[in-house]
Amino acid sequence: MAVAQCPASCGELIQGWILGSEKLVSCPVEWYSTVEVTSGSPLTDERPLSRAMVDRLLQHWQYPAHLSQDIRIDVQSTIPIAKGMASSTADIAATAIAAAHYLGHQLDEPTLAQLCVSLEPTDSTVFRKLTLFDHNNASTQIGCEAQPQLDLLVLESPETLRTADYHRIPRHSGLQAGAAALQRAWEKVQEACISQNPYRLGEAATLSAIASQLLLPKPDFDSLLALVEECDLYGVNVAHSGSVVGLMLDRNRHDVDYIKWMLTQKKLTIHWPEQHLLRMVTGGVELQ
């Protein structure tokens, strides 16, 4: 038996046209998908992509394909689906590490990333460090220094959007229009990690969130920006291919109850009726 877990992401810190193609830096938070791999017949309600990952691993290490039928995958996750919280990446990455361990192997981060993108666009939550990642082909993997500590008030919307559907939206001109802002945002992410400055990270995320309004607009976005200013928060980040939004803050410094009250006053809870206060955590898949 082997058990592994991978964190969710509150959207992305940044996503857009950086260094010649669309890339992202995920925002890992303390909400996990936990996957147990054991011997046994497959569960009837298993997640298809987790099974696809096991099959991909068997292929990778040249095991006979029929072994898959003796491997049971049990995914335990309450991460919201199709809202930009990297639920699918968490499932398949945790499956990969648990299944690899079950088969007596280890996977390094670049190989894990490559296996994940072979199944679907992947979030950079698979890396321990904040990482600029080409989520379509894993060709770029640039890690940052240790990330500054902060919390996120994650605003959850009932709206859903499958990542695959987002990738069908024509967005090349919008991505190009935001390229200069995203280059600045990427530089600020690196500076924030070097100087351990959460405000700098918030500036980076806010720049990217503003650019994302051209591609997948969030409702009442100006009210969100005003709230960030009024409450002196670090910034706002968004799911660039989903509906969640994160208010970047410090639960010990900022008055979270007041912020929630402000969300109601500004009628922002109409769009985001659920809120979750979560720590930003280091990414990467951990064996349990």
UniProtKB/Swiss-Prot annotation:
Enzyme class of the recorded protein, top EC level: transferase
Residues binding ATP: P80, I81, A82, K83, G84, M85, A86, S87, S88, T89, A90
Molecular function GO labels: ATP binding; kinase activity
Catalytic reaction list: L-threonine + ATP = O-phospho-L-threonine + ADP + H(+)
Example GO BP: cobalamin biosynthetic process
Pathways involved: Cofactor biosynthesis; adenosylcobalamin biosynthesis; Polyol metabolism; 1,2-propanediol degradation
Ranges in coiled-coil conformation: none
Name listed for the protein in its UniProt record: L-threonine kinase
Name of the coding gene: pduX
